[in-house]
Amino acid sequence: MSRQLSRARPATVLGAMEMGRRMDAPTSAAVTRAFLERGHTEIDTAFLYSDGQSETILGGLGLRMGSSDCRVKIATKANPWIGNSLKPDSVRSQLETSLKRLQCPRVDLFYLHAPDHSAPVEETLRACHQLHQEGKFVELGLSNYAAWEVAEICTLCKSNGWILPTVYQGMYSATTRQVETELFPCLRHFGLRFYAYNPLAGGLLTGKYKYEDKDGKQPVGRFFGTQWAEIYRNHFWKEHHFEGIALVEKALQAAYGASAPSMTSAALRWMYHHSQLQGAHGDAVILGMSSLEQLEQNLAAAEEGPLEPAVVDAFNQAWHLFAHECPNYFI
């Protein structure tokens, strides 16, 4: 659905997943500096990212995160994967390890990265409340939970007097809109803001890939050569997705001619101006990158204006082409 220009623009968050993986420490420092110099303040990492190197690199930047007078806000996440769980001991261990890596006394936002169906959710939430009371984090967030789980968690927290979640981080882009149907109404009801990850559908909405690329040898990246590549291909690498992207590229040429914005720019402008994100609610877009140049391009696109109506219509057509294959927003 198209939105008016007058609405408040969603915030921008720096996604630090590639720090320590495709970006070394000096590049990560340059990226962070460039992001902060544009006036943005929120950084998103996780216990899991780059086997802890993302947090360690951020901790070594001297940002004094977690101090009362620091304008930089840091978020991290505890996960139920690779030998971890969301049982109380593991949640505590992960958060305390993250604080050591980040060299800060507390984080501004602490997420449960995904549901742990082997751990009673009441125990997890009680542990989070205890950690909050100890001053180890300010806000509680959820990521990759189903709408009914969000409702259950909010109800449990309210009835027990525990800290309530205030942020949900989920997958959302111009061609992956499953969150709009039931999750967004749930979040609005319970007062959670929404932070969108994968706004470029894992990079597919850059337009640099072709469907046939999967059959040949490709350089290491989001879709090839990493431990996450198969997951991303299973999520996004569908023939209908590429057909939808071609529709948008055609509409861009028809609407703008020789001055047509890039596919990346168009996809990000859709997020900021035509999605269901609302800056007035505190919603945000998480921008990831694997280089300083990529970040600067994405930040520039995020500052541009709305798209021509014909391009917005083409994105809607692309979504309807791919909707039946859209990956679930929950795990």
From Swiss-Prot:
Substrate binds at residues 113, 232. The modification Phosphoserine is found at residue 85. Signal peptide: none annotated. It comes from the Eukaryota. InterPro entries: AKR_Detox_Biosynth, NADP_OxRdtase_dom, NADP_OxRdtase_dom_sf. Keywords: NADP, Oxidoreductase, Phosphoprotein. This is Aflatoxin B1 aldehyde reductase member 4. The gene is AKR7L.
